Amino acid sequence: MLVPENMEIERRFIVDAREEKPWRAAGEAVSIEQHYGVGEWLAVGDNALTHKGHVVAAVSEQQRRHLDEVSDWTTRLRRKNATYILTYKSRLTKDTSLELEWTVSSEMAERLLENGPFPSVRKTRYVVTRPDGFVWEVDEFEGALAGLVLAEVELQSSDQSVTMPEWIGHEITGLRSWSNRALAETLARESA
């Protein structure tokens, strides 16, 4: 069974990173910075997301329907190496989310970020394909969250079984206090 377009089914875990870190040798490293709440500065038009009259991204009919039908969105602007991705994400169940994404020019991303500061996190992500074919994303957080390591795996269905790597710890799927947004908001409150 294929996951419907714009749907994401994933499980999340705390990683035991006290000793060996085998995901570093097995995966590609990507630098990521994520800013939350940028959607407050965006307007949703018939066919575009705009910021102060400037088009940020084109919106398809299907995306527009989702934006109209769902009211509980988390908005995120992610810098992944040199690429910026704007995301609207809404949790449907503990492990399933509706996710809309657009690539944004670096110029427009900088314009959006000028409205901040926004709650944010920085991390290095290692993308690891295991022998069973599952792709794990292992995030080593930086800054005030240094030492925290989380992992997630995307699935085709909520009941799909997956073999856990030896470094996987406690499952945190569906625990909102462990979402990247919640971590970013906690850091923002503590630094205020």
Report residues per predicted region.
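Phosphate-end processing signature that detects enzymes handling 5′-triphosphorylated RNA
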Residues: 1-192
